[in-house]
Regions:
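Metal-dependent catalytic neighborhoods of phosphoester/phosphodiester hydrolases
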Residues: 6-11, 47-53, 121
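Well-ordered alpha-helical segments within folded domains of soluble proteins
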Residues: 1-3, 37-38, 162-163
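Short, solvent-exposed loop/turn segments at secondary-structure junctions
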Residues: 5-8, 44-46, 81-82, 170-172
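N-terminal/domain-start segments enriched in small and hydrophobic, helix-friendly residues
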Residues: 22-49
Length: 240
């Protein structure tokens, strides 16, 4: 759920229609025995810009889905220009407090500064909640050992890390596939037993889309319906 961008929830979007999309997604995932993330897709700004609005949104979501053990809440996707100690953590404490009024055990994901690259910034100042994980993102064509080092710093300090967005192209979501870097990332993910989510399940004409731009089917995809990126990720998750 974009709060601002693309006719977002807070800036002109049809709130009822957007919440119906979420409800459909939760129901589909539940029927299939899958986890589903309700993501407040903060992008390029500090999450505290909309603290009260985020609380209102997550109060509604958590009250509705508190009986769903498969629902995960991501409360700020990719903050930018937001210090962990002075901005993101206080925001997270407030929003998490709201969610916990309705759901005391759901997993909550908290993004970190610089498009969720600075997961090491939480070391020594984590949140006082037993079911929170801290978010790291990567795009293999752009982000390499420097981001893995940040994740390792967090892991070595006992910080639980969740990769809630990644792909094997560059950070624009486009460009060529960097297979060498992608395989290095996959080795790192597997050796550290990290959960990851690929961006994105769409047929948009860009490298990161998992579905071929010529495919209009919404389910039941064959390997031929997948993009090169989609086929790589299918192979990456097979057998996990």
């Amino acid at each position: 759920m974009y709060p601002e961008e693309y006719n977002g929830y807070l800036l002109g979007g049809d709130k009822a229609a957007l919440k119906q999309i979420i409800d459909n997604g939760v129901n589909y995932a539940t029927e299939l025995g899958m986890y589903v993330i309700i993501d407040w897709h903060v992008l390029n700004y500090a999450p505290s810009r909309h603290t009260q609005e985020a609380c209102d949104f997550f109060a509604e979501m958590a009250s509705k889905y508190s009986g769903h053990d498969n629902v995960i809440y991501e409360i700020c996707n990719e903050p930018v220009g937001a210090d962990w100690n002075s901005d993101i953590k206080p925001y997270a404490e407030t929003v998490i407090g709201t969610i916990r009024q309705f759901d005391d055990h759901a997993l909550i994901l908290v993004g970190t500064n610089t498009w969720s690259q600075d997961v090491d910034s939480v070391v020594g100042n984590t949140l006082d909640d037993g079911n929170v994980m801290y978010v790291a993102h990567f795009y293999a064509g752009t982000h390499k050992e420097n981001i893995r080092n940040k994740i390792s710093t967090a892991l070595n300090a006992g910080v639980p890390v969740f990769i809630s967005e990644c792909s094997i192209c560059d950070a624009s979501g486009n460009g060529g596939i960097d297979y060498a870097s992608a395989n290095e990332w996959l080795d790192f993910i597997n050796s550290n037993q990290l959960s990851f989510i690929a961006w994105s399940l769409s047929n948009k004409a860009e490298t990161s889309a998992l579905i071929s731009s010529g495919c209009s089917a919404k389910s039941g995809w064959s390997d031929g319906d997948l993009s090169e990126t989609g086929r790589w990720f299918k192979s990456a998750i097979s057998g996990r």
